[in-house]
Amino acid sequence: MASLGAGQALAGVVEGLLAHLLVTAQDADDECSTAAKAAVPSLFTNESGTDVALVAASEQRRTMGAEEAGTSGLMALGARGSTTFDLTASSDLFRLGAPELNARLVILTTAGIVAASTAVAFDRSRRRRRIPTWAAVLIGIGFVLAFLAWAGAGSRGVIPLVTILSSALGLSVPLVYGSLAGIIGERSGTINIAIEGQLLGGAFLGAVVASACSNPWVGILAAPVAGVLVALLLALFGLRYRVNQIVVGVVLNVLVSGLTGFLFSTFLSSSPSLNRALRLPTLAVPLLSRIPIIGPVLFRQTILVYLMYAAVAVLSVMLFRSRWGLRLRACGEHPKAADTVGINVMRTRVANLALAGALAGLGGAFFTVGSGLSFENDMTAGNGYIALAAMILGAWRPLGSLGAALLFGFATSVAQTLPVIGSSVSPDIISMIPYIVTILAVAGFVGKVRAPAAEGVPYP
């Protein structure tokens, strides 16, 4: 029963949160995609001439939140005992304490909130109006609280909510940087499978340079260089010599893994002074960092997190509200049309691929100087591929990819926390949480979003 409930719970979490990401992306379709639809209508319509993106978005609108409400009810049937939530950090302006709540009551209450929000979303969908953001937020938050109450029911410890959320944000940092790198590359028409190698290269170079200079700040300046080098190799073989970009990306990942492994075993193992565990200082924003719950999570972080906020905000605006963004998207949607109006497609793709590599390399620094760890072989552990999944689930948009990355980070954080508090959920189920979430998300949503029309297509 516990295993079945866990699977249903995870499916509900994934589909509820990602449905909103997909719907938002489809509702905000940009002018470049409109031009591409006019130029190549067969790519975007089915046999009857119906826009497939609109069909997918409509389906998600109508089902959004329904499974979450039903799954919350099932969890309430299996919940026994109480759950204690720790809501306070030591530096908060005021302490909220650690209330002990009846697990079944919490689940039923949140199920009611989810059901009400679902009704609003369904009504707005029926009238072909945009679903309000607050409804999607309530569905996501309500279901997360229900899942935590169910998982912690009858456990020996407390649910450290602030710790879980802080850990989720930290774990999502390299995923966000990686997904932004993927967005820039693929929006300009280049498939960037080499994100894993760029993250690993950034982690390696950041650790070595920081150790050599005894300064972690220098490390985050060096890390993007590794990402740019990998990106330029991808541009050389994938764009200049027209080798299949997916194959080149995979080969580069293997190359970086082998090269960093060789350097680690040959030089770093015998010279510990070049591989020290240096950490960037935590920077607290005055007053904001002392707000209960959200303050420690959002405003007591390292510079890498604050740069991540800025990168998402700037890219969200520049990608759709600037001349640079229009040129970039034109190269990814219809490079021939872009060339016709005087845009150098090759130069645009190479330059933006280098920018993407710099972002991914900076994200790789999180594994070493951002976390206070020394470099280890393959320490990125496939995060580059998960970042690609976040990019797809976010419909190639910065805010959508941020939400998907946070979801994956939250799943990993929960998997790390539940065994510590003595949760009654099977340890086998707990260890599977991050992978189940990734598989469910990709399987459920990857066919319902559209990639840039000319991604992976060499030009000229």
Language-model features: locations:
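Cytosolic-side transmembrane-helix boundaries in multi-pass membrane proteins
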Residues: 1-28, 32, 38-89, 108-149, ...
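Short, non-helical or kinked segments that cap or interrupt transmembrane helices
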Residues: 184-205, 217-220, 239-252, 351, ...
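Helix-loop-helix "hairpin" substructures at the membrane interface of multi-pass membrane proteins
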Residues: 298-375, 398-399, 403
